[in-house]
UniProtKB/Swiss-Prot annotation:
Protein name, per record: Large ribosomal subunit protein bL35
A Gene Ontology biological process term: translation
CC terms in the record's Gene Ontology section: large ribosomal subunit
Family matches, as InterPro entries: Ribosomal_bL35, Ribosomal_bL35-like, Ribosomal_bL35_CS, Ribosomal_bL35_sf
Keywords: Ribonucleoprotein, Ribosomal protein
Gene3D superfamilies assigned: 4.10.410.60
Family: Belongs to the bacterial ribosomal protein bL35 family.
NCBIfam families the UniProt entry points to: rpmI_bact
Signal peptide: none
Amino acid sequence: MPKLKTHRGLAKRIKISGSGKYLRKKAGKSHLLSGKSRKRKRNLKKTVIVDSTNVKAVKKLLPYL
Protein backbone atom coordinates (compact mmCIF):
# COMPACT_ATOMS: atom_id res chain seq x y z
CA MET A 1 0.00 0.00 0.00
CA PRO A 2 1.37 3.47 -0.86
CA LYS A 3 2.32 6.04 1.74
CA LEU A 4 -0.38 8.49 2.81
CA LYS A 5 0.22 12.16 2.13
CA THR A 6 -0.10 14.77 4.86
CA HIS A 7 -2.41 17.67 3.99
CA ARG A 8 0.18 20.47 4.14
CA GLY A 9 -2.37 23.29 4.43
CA LEU A 10 -3.89 21.77 7.55
CA ALA A 11 -0.50 20.79 8.98
CA LYS A 12 0.52 24.47 8.98
CA ARG A 13 -2.67 25.50 10.81
CA ILE A 14 -2.81 22.89 13.57
CA LYS A 15 -0.55 22.06 16.50
CA ILE A 16 -0.81 19.07 18.83
CA SER A 17 -0.87 19.66 22.59
CA GLY A 18 1.07 17.56 25.07
CA SER A 19 -2.06 15.55 25.85
CA GLY A 20 -2.67 14.83 22.15
CA LYS A 21 -5.44 17.33 21.48
CA TYR A 22 -5.44 19.37 18.26
CA LEU A 23 -5.14 23.14 18.69
CA ARG A 24 -6.16 25.78 16.15
CA LYS A 25 -6.47 29.56 15.89
CA LYS A 26 -9.81 31.31 15.46
CA ALA A 27 -10.82 32.78 12.11
CA GLY A 28 -11.60 36.46 11.53
CA LYS A 29 -8.49 38.19 12.90
CA SER A 30 -6.63 39.19 9.71
CA HIS A 31 -8.42 42.23 8.25
CA LEU A 32 -11.52 44.46 8.58
CA LEU A 33 -10.73 44.78 12.29
CA SER A 34 -11.87 48.39 12.78
CA GLY A 35 -15.53 47.32 12.90
CA LYS A 36 -14.92 44.71 15.57
CA SER A 37 -14.96 45.52 19.28
CA ARG A 38 -11.86 45.35 21.45
CA LYS A 39 -13.38 42.44 23.38
CA ARG A 40 -14.15 40.51 20.19
CA LYS A 41 -10.62 40.99 18.84
CA ARG A 42 -9.13 39.95 22.18
CA ASN A 43 -11.21 36.75 22.17
CA LEU A 44 -10.19 35.99 18.57
CA LYS A 45 -6.53 35.86 19.68
CA LYS A 46 -7.12 32.74 21.75
CA THR A 47 -6.16 29.24 20.65
CA VAL A 48 -8.96 26.68 20.85
CA ILE A 49 -9.20 22.89 20.80
CA VAL A 50 -10.53 21.33 17.58
CA ASP A 51 -14.12 20.20 18.15
CA SER A 52 -14.68 16.48 18.68
CA THR A 53 -16.86 16.28 15.55
CA ASN A 54 -13.91 17.39 13.39
CA VAL A 55 -11.16 15.31 15.02
CA LYS A 56 -11.81 12.27 12.81
CA ALA A 57 -11.40 14.37 9.65
CA VAL A 58 -8.23 16.00 11.02
CA LYS A 59 -6.68 12.61 11.82
CA LYS A 60 -7.42 11.43 8.28
CA LEU A 61 -5.71 14.48 6.76
CA LEU A 62 -2.72 14.31 9.14
CA PRO A 63 -1.85 10.60 9.27
CA TYR A 64 1.67 11.02 10.71
CA LEU A 65 1.21 13.92 13.14
